[in-house]
Amino acid sequence: MGMTMTQKILAAHAGLEAVKAGQLIEANLDLVLGNDITTPVAVNEFKKFGTDKVFSKSQIAIVPDHFTPNKDIKAAEQVKYIREFAQNMEIENFFEVGEMGIEHCLLPEKGLVVAGDVVIGADSHTCTYGALGAFSTGIGSTDMAAGMATGKCWFKVPSALKFVLKNKPAKWISGKDIILHIIGMIGVDGALYKSMEFVGDGLQYLSMDDRFTMANMAIEAGGKNGIFPVDDKTEEYLKDHASREWKVYEADEDAEYDKVFEIDLSELRPTVSFPHLPDNTRTIDNTGDVAIDQVVIGSCTNGRISDLRMARDILKGKKVKKGIRCIVIPGTQKIYLQAIKEGIVTDLVEAGAAFSTPTCGPCLGGHMGILAKGERCVSTTNRNFVGRMGHVESEVYLASPAVAAASALTGKITDPELV
């Protein structure tokens, strides 16, 4: 039996000719990632190894993004601690405020992840880089520490689910709608410890930003990783961004999949995930009359330039409904600058939105838009658990930038076609 794309990448990095689902392996790492929340714990564990150096100064990335710019004294102390560690270890890829971005937007932009890589990150949405044809997955701070010390990590080789995407997406359908549809279909544990492998002729219509969004939310279905084959769009992106050579892996024709799903993108409708799990989805036609208090457009899921363009296209020349808060957060400084050059920032601010420096901020209930008791938010983020963005009695509705922007105009969950 042949191997899936994920299995081929893992086999190569383990120095093996072949692997099979369930097999335990030790693989060489191309990149180890941490942020301001997870890295302090990893540093504490790293110090127990008794080594005075990391395995590679260039293959570790530390991105303070969750509580930055520092939201309080504790946040400042955490970043100071990991900044000093990075300086002492001469880690090349420590990204300070002013040069940083949300980690999963920043690393592809900097070319630090390329096709064929094996990447671990002490953040669950590290699976984002599967959009580039890499195997990337979230791990805990202890594994991050071991990775920084040894350049290796152990894995159980995952089995796979295959998603065959067919036809051109219907109007307003983005990567966010597709992945919410999939999660709603299979459930938050539907891909538990499996690779989610996306294929099909529908890929030609999906931008890299769409793919980043979809791979990002593989974890919300329980997936070990999400991954896309390398095609012309991937190659074009890598040529523009990659800092080193990449390698293309393709699934064998006789690769084994636990299940194959066919999805006709032309039949999808904008999709919203209701509280309090990402799989509690409804199409925009079945959302009912849900009044909201806040809209957030941004995050590692939807903070890229195409997302901001979509929000601008809907909000330009209009006004956010009185009493509604609309917060827009670009994924990186480069995206921020591009939004300035294109007039997006001006258009959004004139519409009544607040525009922020890059940060994870409200996504995890950190800062920059916390919800009070009883408040509702339409957000382009990736999780809507109880208390995720603030008070335990607040509610988060996950949606695309188009639905979020339309909802900001009306003060309720709204089909973008209607504004």
Curated annotation (Swiss-Prot):
Keywords of the record: 4Fe-4S, Amino-acid biosynthesis, Branched-chain amino acid biosynthesis, Iron, Iron-sulfur, Leucine biosynthesis, Lyase, Metal-binding
Cofactor stoichiometry and binding remark: Binds 1 [4Fe-4S] cluster per subunit.
Enzyme's top EC category: lyase
Pathway: Amino-acid biosynthesis; L-leucine biosynthesis; L-leucine from 3-methyl-2-oxobutanoate: step 2/4
Reaction catalysed by this enzyme: (2R,3S)-3-isopropylmalate = (2S)-2-isopropylmalate
One protein family per Pfam: Aconitase
Residues that bind [4Fe-4S] cluster: 300, 360, 363
GO biological process, alphabetically ordered: L-leucine biosynthetic process
One GO MF term attached to the UniProt entry: 3-isopropylmalate dehydratase activity
Gene3D superfamilies: Aconitase, domain 3
InterPro entries associated with the record: Acnase/IPM_dHydase_lsu_aba_1/3 (IPR015931), Acoase/IPM_deHydtase_lsu_aba (IPR001030), Aconitase_4Fe-4S_BS (IPR018136), Aconitase_4Fe-4S_dom (IPR036008), HAcnase/IPMdehydase_lsu_prok (IPR011826), Homoacnase/IPMdehydase_lsu (IPR006251), IPM_dehydratase_rel_enz (IPR050067), IPMI_cat (IPR033941)
Cofactors that this protein relies on: [4Fe-4S] cluster
EC numbers: 4.2.1.33
Function: Catalyzes the isomerization between 2-isopropylmalate and 3-isopropylmalate, via the formation of 2-isopropylmaleate.
Quaternary structure note: Heterodimer of LeuC and LeuD.
Family as reported in the entry's similarity comment: Belongs to the aconitase/IPM isomerase family. LeuC type 2 subfamily.
Protein name: 3-isopropylmalate dehydratase large subunit
Native source species: Clostridium beijerinckii (strain ATCC 51743 / NCIMB 8052)
